[in-house]
């Protein structure tokens, strides 16, 4: 009897997040008490092919000055912790034009919505089915949630 062993490569990938990063599961939103910011669950979730991500910048007690500017980035990562996309701001308020990538953008206190078309940045290729992380950074303070693409 002859046995044949197939050589295989198994990769276990863990998304590395700082200890103070909030990762929510089963909740509708995650909050950062330092900046008063909130990151909501994307909708729809799971999604195919596009999704929206609602978030709030500033809040009581950090938003006593409505003209205060916050440096904001929203990025999407695969489970290998590789950045694959930057959503765009959708329907922004009067001080910011919508459609701009949410990378080091200065925003005032308020409610915002980001849009992701489900495509990998720099390509016209749709992201594969699976679990992804999206991370909001407000003045360097991160909040992370997960989302699922289902084809």
Locations of the language-model features?
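Short, compositionally biased serine/threonine- and acidic-rich segments at solvent-exposed termini, linkers
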Residues: 2-34
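Short loop/turn motifs at secondary-structure boundaries
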Residues: 25-151
